[in-house]
Amino acid sequence: MLGLGTLARKIFGTPNDRKVKSVRSLVARINDLEPEFQALSDEGIKQKTAEFQRRVQEGGESLDDLLPEAFANCREGARRALGLRAFDVQLMGGIFLHQGNIAEMKTGEGKTLVATFPAYLNALAGKGVHVVTVNDYLAKRDAEWMGKVYAQLGLATGVVYPFQSDEEKKAAYAADITYATNNELGFDYLRDNMKASKEEMRQRGHFFAIVDEVDSILIDEARTPLIISGPSQDRSDLYTKVDKLIPELVEEHYKLDEKTRNVTFTEEGNEFLEKRLLETGLLPEGQSLYDPESTTIVHHVNQGLRAHKLFNRDQQYIVRDDEIMLIDEFTGRMMRGRRLSDGLHQAIEAKEGVSIQPENVTLASVTFQNYFRLYEKLGGMTGTAATEAEEFMEIYGLGVVEVPTNRPVARADEHDAVYRTAREKHDGIVASIKDAHERGQPILVGTTSIDKSEALSDLLKSAGIPHNVLNARQHEQEAQIVADAGKLGAVTIATNMAGRGTDIQLGGNVEMKVMQALAADPAAHPDEVRARIEAEHAEEKERVKEAGGLFVLGTERHESRRIDNQLRGRSGRQGDPGRSAFFLSLEDDLMRIFGSDRLDKVLSTLGMKEGEAIVHPWVNKSLEKAQAKVEARNFDIRKQLLKFDDVMNDQRKAIFSQRLEIMETEDLSEIAQDMRYQVIDDLIDQHMPPRSYADQWDIEGMHRAVQDKLGLDAPLAKWAQEEGVDQDVVRERLCEASDRQMTEKAEAFGPETMRSIEKQILLQTIDAKWREHLLTLEHLRSVVGFRGYAQRDPLSEYKTEAFALFESMLNSLRQDVTQKLAQVRPLSEEEQQAMMRQFLDQQRAAAAAEAPVAPAPQPAAAAPQPTPELVGAEAGEPDPAAWGNVARNDPCPCGSGLKYKHCHGRLD
């Protein structure tokens, strides 16, 4: 008998069915327009793009109204540029992306081509579209490949990757459609908000982003903040000394919680540690671990414990070229340039005996959650999103739509096989691989870590089974290994295949084979080579199909069902046959941590023999329940982290917005004046409290403060003795005196130079104060959780204190800006010449030693500038004739620190 829910779905359809049905009329309209666009010339297609741009940008037509025509034009452009005609389901995927949804499309359904449709349509608005990929290789590959489509349509394509110059990045972001990784987009956003002028900024706004592998970026990476950091003090010696103590610990000294990935010292551990720290001199005599002075050493010891007990070589990281390289637990890739914060990376470096890099201080940070919420519209693609649909909707406002496959999935998904021990499981895996290999069926074996992939590789070597291994160590050969994975009888062991970005094609990859053949014989005719290889490939593909297609064998369940589904999804692409199965044991991490005791009792009751496996739907359901619990817990953690980060995000947006306003404003004298007046108000409130008499005022303290903050020697004692002088009179006189002082400075510097100085000082001070504030918030966040023990809500406490700290930072900012502007003064000609001589001496000494040239000393009035290039100038009077052509916005070669146009290049 059918349940009520099942019956309702059969009658009314699922919500997903209704969404798919709702766009069928649009797809039909696009199909109806196809002959019209096929009749256009190549130039006619480009002219259509120009027409669409006018209709949107000048005529005010909506993108939704333009969608059928734009998609029809894009489909024809792709057909001519790539020889690919988009299927109806690909058009559906494109429509859902344009509508701001996540399109769940199975592997091999052509997601890369799907992205071109909404990217083209939204690029017509002229605000730029970002297509986001998970790594630089895919960004470059997709930009080059799909760039042919956009070029056919008359649009420009850009690609952003690390180590480009500012000009290259600006050009890439100025293109109609820009391909980039999530990391580089986030870092460029932070870098832009550290620039000194708007002209230097690279990004031009956040209009529409299409995120490939959206679940990997917006969920798996959501807890990882992007941090731009600078070096702080070097404490590598302390890490090394602490690391020597950790191996002395025994199990009674610490408590390890694998579920939450946390480790803490027990009371016995603290006592042992205190004793050893005193013996080694790391803790001064008479001081205990619980004293406030011991905070630093306790922090180092805790990080050392985490490095040893939570981070394992070849699982969470590998050692390469005297460096610790982190490994992405979801994709198995190395994360170059990524470091753990708070001294944990240094603790791992000490553990492995590699060079310890200095700790860093945060200069700017943002999480992916908050970065991608900057976009006016967001869309995403993935093969697996349904299990996280609630999180996508709650945090990002993104609906998930499962797009039908072009052909029905023919893959057979088998129930999990569960063994008692890991040894029995491995025997079963090797036997299964051997059987499939002998039948010619290609096999992809998924493992969860490098060490497990290499252990399985050793077992296959012993069994005499040829195979390839794909993990972070072999990432350079990734494309070749994946291309070969679908060949007859191929055996490929891979760490998590999520986000690999390359389809495993039955019979191997034709394009890769053609490239290799042409590289081996450059004289061969490309068309003949392709025809021969395509014929061979078709024959091999049929043999692979007869053998059962690609067999995906998972050796362990991941905490996330989504990662397991991604592994399964590598098989059965475009209606190909395939098979998937997971071989598990009660010793696997997920089974061990999340309650294998009950299952162990069941297996014992059944009286299973050595080497036998239990295969039953009940086992699958139990595992999926355990995975769902882990996913729910991780979702709660991400939600809670987002609530905390939202507090900082509001402050970040306020600071970045203020910074942008300062960069865009030519004359900041009013802002500087408002700050000055506020500082005067604060000083009066502090030293001359309201409703107090003159004889109660702190005249001496006020005089010192006015000299320090305003640079004024005001006769406050004399004013206080005058009849009728109150706080308002003092305020008015100080404001007038400070205004006169700033007017005189502007005359001495010249108005244009003074405005430039005000801007530089404001931006430099904001950046410095924001850096300090980030550090303070980090410390607050690390301790505010303890307020829960006092029955106080940590989040409410964090919000209250973070707001108070923000106000305090703004107050400090006003004081520092006012003080710096009060102290700034023009350099005399003698001082400029002295600085010039000093710089030339340094340059000659550096040239003689073949060492880098030290930067020129900077006057107090100027921001640090790049080292000026001097051509043939001698010590003494600067000789402009010897400087060659100097750009007007470059630093003046005389060493004044001013721009050339404001100094020796002035047109007066």
Curated annotation (Swiss-Prot):
Cellular localisation: Cell inner membrane; Cytoplasm
Biased composition (Low complexity): 846-864
Any single Gene Ontology cellular-component annotation: plasma membrane
TM stretches of this protein: none
SMART domains per record: SecA_DEAD (SM00957), SecA_PP_bind (SM00958)
Subunit structure: Monomer and homodimer. Part of the essential Sec protein translocation apparatus which comprises SecA, SecYEG and auxiliary proteins SecDF-YajC and YidC.
NCBIfam families in UniProt: PRK12904.1, secA
Name of the protein: Protein translocase subunit SecA
Native source organism of the sequence: Cereibacter sphaeroides (strain KD131 / KCTC 12085) (Rhodobacter sphaeroides)
Gene: secA
